[in-house]
Amino acid sequence: MNTKITNFTFAFDKKNLNLAETIIKKYPPEGKRSAILPLLDLAQRQNGGWLHVSAIEYVANMLEMPYMRAYEVATFYTMFNLNPIGKYHIQVCTTTPCWLRGSDNIMKICEKKLAIKHKETTKDQKFTLSEIECLGACVNAPVVQINDDYYEDLNEAKMEKLIEQYLNEFKSKMQNG
């Protein structure tokens, strides 16, 4: 975990510190540890989509809880990333309903188009690909989450088109500066 990145310290910027304090105030003083999920999410967003050990420690200290408890939360939920990820995190649900509707083929399309496998990031740091557990949208399987957006009722052609849209977005941004 995070062994490649050393000498990294985390602190909320002023805006996020104010937001964190507002979040904590929503809980009674004796229950402020309940703010762990939103604060870890806030830290992850500030840090480019992943949680360094120092970010987990910072949040634990802010909530006056043992680091290990905060670490347990960060490692339990798949929404937290403990290593750097690409700008776009493509998460393919591969649990039974999505698998029955072709999520394995969706995963293969992603691997082919991006030339990466599960838990890998493209060399340009634009995309990370992950297989994940249920996204809770089984009625519209198969489902893919890219950052905060859900894409439902996918098939191979739709997934290829979706990846092309993200790839073309990068090409146009690079050309337009």
Curated annotation (Swiss-Prot):
| N-terminal signal peptide | none
| Single GO molecular function | metal ion binding
Q: Which InterPro entries match?
A: NuoE-like, NuoE_dom, NuoE_N, Thioredoxin-like_sf
- What cofactors does the UniProt entry give for this protein? [2Fe-2S] cluster
Q: Which domain of life is it from?
A: Bacteria
Co-factor: note: Binds 1 [2Fe-2S] cluster.
Protein function: NDH-1 shuttles electrons from NADH, via FMN and iron-sulfur (Fe-S) centers, to quinones in the respiratory chain. Couples the redox reaction to proton translocation (for every two electrons transferred, four hydrogen ions are translocated across the cytoplasmic membrane), and thus conserves the redox energy in a proton gradient.
Name of the protein in question: NADH-quinone oxidoreductase subunit E
- Organism of this sequence: Rickettsia prowazekii (strain Madrid E)
Q: Which gene encodes it?
A: nuoE
